[in-house]
Amino acid sequence: MVVRTGTCSFCEYRIYPGRGQRFIAKDGRGFFFLTKKAKCLSLRKVKAQKITWTIARRRLWKKVKATDIAQKKKKRNVTVARAIVGISLEEINRRKNLDASHKKAEAEKAVRELKQKKANDIEKKRADRKLQGKDVKAAKKAETKKTKQPVGAKGGKK
């Protein structure tokens, strides 16, 4: 039969069923003390390491094996590849596994495409400007023809 035991909050001894005293502080923290002596020392805020009979003191002076203290396992971050908006997971993996020469060739290809696109945009703008310029010139000519001034004598006042 296994007996459920607790540990004293001050001296760290085992507390068997029917023993000890539970203390709840004003801030809601719960303590479990083995004896009245442990409770009084804890409430007076005496450090357990300064009291010779506590396990904290024995641990400080290396009288207790360090293997008794459980060590926490380190959390290791696991990297997971996920798709990004616009690029699928397969595309990301393909780009990761490319050789340096392939990467360089792809980069050059992308640069060439960008330059070509810019050149096309510039030519388009120039063509639009030429068309606009012709329209403006034609409109000006039409205005000048419509509003011809009457020919009269040149000169000053009479």
Swiss-Prot record:
Signal sequence range: none
Superkingdom of this protein's organism: Eukaryota
Region span, Disordered: 98-158
GO-annotated cellular components: cytosolic large ribosomal subunit
Ranges of Basic and acidic residues composition bias in the record: 98-146
UniProt cross-references to PANTHER family, sorted A to Z: 60S RIBOSOMAL PROTEIN L24, RIBOSOMAL PROTEIN L24
Keyword Manganese: no
Protein name: Large ribosomal subunit protein eL24
Organism: Tetrahymena thermophila (strain SB210)
Similarity comment: Belongs to the eukaryotic ribosomal protein eL24 family.
GO biological process assignments: cytoplasmic translation
Gene3D superfamilies in the cross-refs: 6.10.250.1270, Ribosomal protein L24e
A Pfam family that the UniProt record links to this protein: Ribosomal_L24e
Family matches, as InterPro entries: L24e/L24_sf, Ribosomal_eL24, Ribosomal_eL24-rel_N
One GO molecular-function entry: structural constituent of ribosome
Key words, A-Z: Ribonucleoprotein, Ribosomal protein
